[in-house]
Swiss-Prot record:
The protein, known as: UPF0102 protein Asuc_1462
HAMAP family hit by this protein: UPF0102
PANTHER family listed in its UniProt record: UPF0102 PROTEIN YRAN
Top-rank lineage group of the source organism: Bacteria
SUPFAM superfamilies: Restriction endonuclease-like
Transmembrane segments: none
Organism (species): Actinobacillus succinogenes (strain ATCC 55618 / DSM 22257 / CCUG 43843 / 130Z)
């Protein structure tokens, strides 16, 4: 079993990465940290940057994994993506990008992929 929440999160992020690679996306980076927030996974779908948030909930007592992505989390996600793009002299306005959510239930096999979650 997992010793820490961080180890559990890393395991689900790895499962999400493998799932997305099986769907044809290419891995770019993981766990990119900025003052404004973190990017769990950055993938590429052709020429499109895909910023992936990975969420997991073992119970829906406090809401599902999808419901846990509130307005504040969405803003942090956008801000972190803009920071990552800025490091490459790009921005959300001029880069081809999208924001996908990978939501897990209790297990890694209980996976839901929501492309264009912030559309």
């Amino acid at each position: 079993m997992f010793k820490t929440t961080r180890e559990k999160g890393a395991s689900f992020e790895q499962q999400a990465r493998l799932f997305l690679e099986q769907q044809g996306l290419r891995f770019i980076a993981a766990n990119q940290h900025f003052k404004c927030g973190e990017l769990d996974l950055i993938m590429a779908d052709g020429d499109t940057y895909v910023f992936v948030e990975v969420r997991q909930r073992k119970t829906i007592l406090f809401g599902s994994a999808v419901e846990s992505v509130d307005w504040r989390k969405q803003q942090k996600w956008l801000d972190a993506a803009n920071m990552w793009l800025a490091q490459r002299n790009l921005s959300l306005e001029d880069a081809d990008c999208r924001f996908d959510l990978i939501a897990f239930g209790r297990t890694a096999s209980d996976i839901e992929w929501l492309p264009n979650f912030l559309d």
